[in-house]
Regions:
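Divalent-metal coordination cores built from histidine and acidic residues
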Residues: 14-111, 115
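Histidine/acidic-residue-rich catalytic or RNA/ligand-binding cores of hydrolases
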Residues: 28, 110-123, 164-171, 186-198, ...
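Hard-cation-handling environments
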Residues: 160, 169-174, 178-189, 219-221
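His/Asp/Glu-enriched, well-ordered alpha-helical/loop segment
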Residues: 125-153, 200, 221, 227-228, ...
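Divalent metal-coordination and catalytic microenvironments
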Residues: 46, 75, 105, 154, ...
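Glycine-enriched alpha-helix->loop->beta-strand junction motifs that scaffold or abut catalytic
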Residues: 69-73, 96-99, 173-177, 199-200, ...
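Conserved small/polar residues in nucleotide/adenosyl-binding loops
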Residues: 1-2, 6-13, 271-277
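Active-site glycine- and acidic-residue-rich loops that bind
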Residues: 79-92, 155-169, 206-214
């Protein structure tokens, strides 16, 4: 955490959200206090994000009032979806009244079913199991529906598909309290890069198609996407050696600002003030 804070300061990243997929999980006040104490040694401000469910297990909800009082700014089962819609609905309401927002990782694991990259022409040619875009779109639409019906906010993490982008845009225009984010790789890179079977291009959600990249880019430009995040998830080279068995995730902290400027500012799609705001 401290080393990441130092790197972040060098990359002009002043604030960081510490997601709850830590050991131990950020599901109690004691862990939040520990993180904030350690953060004092770093040169950046750290904002803890608590977990929605204890141990990220998806079943027993955390005490949101306790987490918020300890210093959490939001809750999320980072990297995992809350499969049970009833639990998610209850979490969205309780988080709202506790003064926090739910950040949803939108992924239907039954559809993912062991897939390792975007389902499409490239996955078929490589002969590997693909992840259908419906895995993201279905849960995104569920969260939007819950937010609209319950009249509480929801934040959609790392949007990667054109359909999810359009659903969020439409919902926001009709007054649903939905915000969202994306990462540079989703408006810069496509699944074509996986033809080389390079696991460095494996991430979750997976790289999609050129049409999705275009849709995400348009979402950034028209303001549907509220912020660009790093989605920093580095792994050692040896972990990425086997294409089919490698974990998902890429370095983002050191590259996100430069990547955003390259893709959006130097192509005249955004002005510097817009890029800074993102």
């Amino acid at each position: 955490e401290i080393s990441l804070g130092l790197v972040g300061s060098e990359m002009c990243i002043r604030d960081r959200a510490c997601m709850p997929n830590t050991n131990p999980t950020i599901d109690n006040a004691e862990t939040v206090h520990y993180i904030l104490e350690k953060a004092k040694e770093a040169k950046t401000r750290v904002y803890p994000v608590g977990s929605i469910t204890k141990g990220l297990g998806g079943s027993e909800m955390c005490d949101f009032e306790e987490l918020h009082k300890a210093g959490c700014v939001a809750v999320s089962d980072d990297g995992r979806p809350v499969k049970n819609a009833r639990i998610m609905a209850e979490a969205m309401v309780k988080a709202h009244y506790a003064g926090m927002k739910v950040i949803s990782h939108c992924e239907d694991l039954d559809i993912v079913n062991g897939g390792i990259m975007n389902y499409g022409e490239v996955s078929k040619e490589l002969g590997v199991k693909g992840i259908h875009r419906l895995s993201e779109d279905i849960i995104t639409e569920r969260e939007i529906t819950l937010a609209a019906d319950l009249e509480v906010p929801i934040h959609i993490a790392h949007v990667s598909t054109a359909q999810s982008m359009q659903n969020i845009r439409t919902a926001a225009r009709f007054g649903t309290m939905v915000t969202c984010e994306t990462a540079p790789h989703y408006f810069m890179l496509t699944d074509e890069l996986l033809r080389s079977r390079d696991a460095d291009y494996r991430m979750n959600p997976p790289l999609r198609t050129a049409a999705d990249v275009q849709a995400i880019t348009e979402g950034v430009i028209d303001g549907t996407i509220d912020c660009i995040i790093t989605d920093h998830a580095p792994h050692a080279p040896e972990e990425k050696a086997d294409f089919e068995k490698a974990p998902n995730g890429v370095v983002g902290l050191e590259t996100s600002l430069a990547a955003t400027l390259t893709a959006l500012y130097h192509t005249c799609l955004l002005y510097t003030s817009d890029a800074a705001a993102e």
